[in-house]
Amino acid sequence: MSTIRRISDVFCQWPSRPIGLIEIIGGSYISIRPEVTYKRLISRLLQRNFAVHSWGYIPNFDHQIQANQAWKQFRLSRKFLEKRVGIIPKSIRLGHSLGCKLHLLSPDGGRNCNGLVAISFNNFKAAQSIPMLKKMSQRLNFQTEFSPSPFETLNLITEHYEQINNLLIKFKNDALDQNNLLLKSLKERHSDKSELMQLMVIISLQ
């Protein structure tokens, strides 16, 4: 396993001669320490000589702000990598659950990557994602929602996300996966090449 370098909130792991770069944003709460949560996945990517940058974060209600933060920190981390090894190809972005949404909301619209791998896309409302929130909102008579909302997110993807190469991975026994809705929004764009892959069993990412 390569040495882990932390640049801002990005955990960077570099082989000596990387052939490419994978930028990972994981799911809610399991991505506070992505270098641990996704250790097995990262190890396999490193074995194939990919540099891996994984963003550590604590989710909040403003997903657009977090998407912007991740994008800026990935850009900074890439600059450090290229100072060491020279120019490398555009990255492949990999998202898991909420991480898919954050990549899709990236302020560059996906233009500065070669594609996105979206594993188990999750775009539920706040009350569905946080059961305790639903109980509190009913008891205290208030409403709160993620920004952008699920409906707004799909519209933003259709109107502003420009990357045509997207691989959506759906696990057959995952009741929370919403990749079918994501694929529908992606396919509404001109020249889209997105594909959905359905797997029978959940592969451990740890």
Predicted regions and their residues:
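C-terminal catalytic histidine-bearing segment of alpha/beta-hydrolase fold enzymes
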Residues: 193-206
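Short, surface-exposed "cap/lid" segments of acyl-processing enzymes
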Residues: 3-59
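The feature captures the conserved acid-bearing segment of alpha/beta-hydrolase catalytic domains
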Residues: 13-16, 115, 125-196
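Short glycine-enriched nucleophile-adjacent loop
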Residues: 100-111, 116
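Short acidic, S/G/P-rich loop/turn micro-motifs used as interaction or catalytic elements
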Residues: 28-31, 60-61, 99, 123-126, ...
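Alpha/beta-hydrolase fold nucleophile elbow
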Residues: 82-98, 102
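Alpha/beta-hydrolase active-site loop
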Residues: 61-89
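Residue in the alpha/beta-hydrolase core beta-strand immediately N-terminal to the catalytic nucleophile
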Residues: 91-92, 115-117
